[in-house]
A protein has these predicted regions:
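The conserved Walker
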Residues: 9
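Hydrophobic positions on the alpha1 helix immediately C-terminal to the Walker A/P-loop
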Residues: 16
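N-terminal phosphate/diphosphate-binding loop that engages ATP/GTP or pyrophosphate donors
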Residues: 21-97
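Conserved glycine(s) of the Walker
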Residues: 12
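Intrinsically disordered, low-complexity terminal tails and inter-domain linkers enriched
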Residues: 42-57, 119-208, 237-239
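Hydrophobic anchor at the beta1->P-loop junction of P-loop NTPases
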Residues: 5
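Phosphate-binding/switch loop-helix module in NTP-utilizing enzymes
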Residues: 93-129, 201-210, 215, 221
Length: 291
């Protein structure tokens, strides 16, 4: 089953998803993919808040977005608020985000690191990663069944080699890394997800839950960004990933359904509430995830 987690911005979807992942792990279900917690800091006293704050009261402001790779828990600084990225020498906005005119400045190197993670997950599920070549039978069939999206730069998503990303990026962090803004935000919010062996070191347990936080305009409108996450979802349910949760903003919900439902069947649209939590947990249990 494909769950599409959606709702208004900054209502706690990722925090809800982190807690859900922790509950799934506690119940014996392997969780693999990525969650994208924000980097939050308290607003200076007297500074007006935006439409939403971390607690709904506007007391916190969002500086950036991290990606936490599951199941191992590795943390990567993924995006920064555009005004802050422009002032920072340590963060370089990638060409993909710039070409798509995204609201956040996203590093191409960070995209490559997350894609390398999803490539490993794809191979464990016997799915060809997006960059494995068009002659692969699995990829070819997925391409036939998947509606085309509008590409960037005549179909070219600027590539960054995964090996280069791993060696050169200053963005890589772990949960016990240096006290940067991302690490401070992580400590303040708490890390509810238990660390596990790296996906490329240990085979994932069967009947795992795939988590993709999130699919945005880069992926659903341009087929760029997290292309290896798209490749796994485009393949539909597999013995390794019979179920998946993808975070999708409301404005892209129709596009996500159009792309994925031919393989998954009718998607289940959920919000960050108790009813959805119980449904996902029961679905995972029925799939044999609890041991």
């Amino acid at each position: 089953m494909l769950f599409l987690l959606t709702g208004d911005v900054q209502i706690g979807k990722t925090r809800w998803l982190e807690n859900l992942c922790a509950s799934l792990q506690a119940a014996g279900t392997c969780v693999a993919g990525v969650v994208a917690p924000g980097q939050w800091v308290p607003r200076p006293e007297g500074q007006p808040g935006g439409k939403h704050g971390f607690d709904g009261a506007g007391r916190f402001e969002k500086l950036g977005i991290d990606n936490v790779l599951l199941p191992q828990g590795k943390r990567i600084e993924f995006a920064r608020r555009r005004d802050l990225a422009a002032k920072s020498k340590a963060f370089t906005e990638g060409t993909q985000a710039k070409a798509a005119k995204l609201g956040w400045a996203i590093s191409d190197t960070a995209i490559a690191q997350v894609n390398a993670h999803f490539a490993t997950l794809a191979k464990q599920a016997s799915i060809a990663p997006a960059d494995s070549g068009a002659d692969d039978s699995t990829t070819t069939q997925a391409e036939v069944d998947t509606p085309a999206a509008a590409p960037l730069d005549n179909g070219v998503c600027p590539p960054v080699a995964a090996e280069t990303a791993a060696k050169t990026s200053p963005l890589v962090q772990t949960n016990t890394g240096e006290s940067t803004a991302a690490a401070t935000a992580a400590k303040a919010g708490g890390n509810v997800l238990a660390a596990a062996p790296a996906a490329n070191e240990t085979r994932l347990a069967p009947h795992a839950m795939l988590v993709v936080d999130e699919l945005g305009r880069l992926e659903l409108l341009h087929s760029c960004g997290l292309t290896n996450a798209l490749a796994i979802l485009d393949a539909g349910p597999t013995p390794q990933f019979p179920h998946a949760i993808a975070v999708v903003r409301e404005t892209l919900l129709d596009e996500a359904r159009r792309r994925f439902e031919p393989r998954w069947g009718k998607a289940t649209v959920i919000g960050p509430d108790d009813a959805a939590r119980n449904l996902v947990l029961e679905t995972a249990r029925a799939a044999g995830g609890a041991h």
